[in-house]
């Protein structure tokens, strides 16, 4: 049975699934309120070093740069509607291939063109991040985000990070005003 996390909680993926080499991260959401304009939310990953910054712009993985330089992190593609149950976007991580310089994988979701469309995370519900074993589909951990991000246009859902020889998953749930530009700047990406 999957470990259910609350904001700030963490779990050792290495202990929960010792034989897992390839993890799949699923991120999901639903539009709660709409004025008729579609919602396009985009998942992205910042592969950061000890200083919390990406090693290079190529370590920002998203729908236009689907694979990290070491080949370990692969975005599975953009879902432009977010409709239906289950994962809206997925990222595959080969934990055995992640460069030793990468200390953390930060998983974020942003609302495309949020300012022009007057959209924010207060209009989004049922957001979640889950980690499961890609080999057998077993869900290891899940974080259902609370719905207290009323005006933010970007959100860090969670992180996979190294802790000694282990990989851990931390539930973050931190909103950001300023959308993708603010998140990218914080993590050292030039956009």
Curated annotation (Swiss-Prot):
Keywords: Plasmid, Tellurium resistance. InterPro entries: Stress/Tellurium_Resist (IPR051324), TerD (IPR003325). It comes from the Bacteria. The keyword Chaperone does not apply. GO terms for biological process: response to tellurium ion. The keyword Chloroplast does not apply. Belongs to the CAPAB/TerDEXZ family. PANTHER family: CAMP-BINDING PROTEIN 1-RELATED, GENERAL STRESS PROTEIN 16U. Not known; seems to contribute to the tellurium resistance (Ter) mechanism. Also involved in phage inhibition (Phi) and colicin resistance (PacB). This is Tellurium resistance protein TerE. It comes from Serratia marcescens. The lineage of its organism: Bacteria, Pseudomonadati, Pseudomonadota, Gammaproteobacteria, Enterobacterales.
């Amino acid at each position: 049975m999957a470990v259910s996390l609350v904001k700030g909680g963490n779990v050792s993926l290495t202990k929960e699934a010792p034989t897992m080499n390839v993890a799949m991260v699923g991120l999901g959401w639903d539009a709660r309120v709409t004025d008729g304009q579609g919602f396009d939310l985009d998942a992205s990953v910042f592969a950061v070093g000890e200083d919390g910054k990406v090693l290079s712009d190529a370590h920002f993985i998203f729908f236009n740069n689907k694979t990290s330089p070491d080949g370990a992190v692969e975005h599975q593609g953009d879902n432009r509607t977010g409709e239906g149950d289950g994962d809206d976007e997925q990222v595959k991580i080969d934990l055995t291939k992640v460069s030793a310089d990468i200390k953390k994988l930060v998983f974020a979701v942003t609302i495309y063109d949020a300012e022009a469309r007057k959209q924010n995370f207060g209009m989004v519900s049922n957001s979640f991040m889950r980690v499961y074993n890609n080999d057998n589909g077993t869900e290891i951990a899940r974080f259902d985000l609370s719905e207290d991000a009323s005006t933010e246009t970007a959100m860090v859902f969670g992180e996979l990070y190294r802790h000694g020889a282990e990989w851990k998953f931390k539930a973050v749930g931190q909103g950001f005003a300023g959308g993708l530009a603010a998140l990218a700047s914080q993590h050292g990406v030039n956009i």
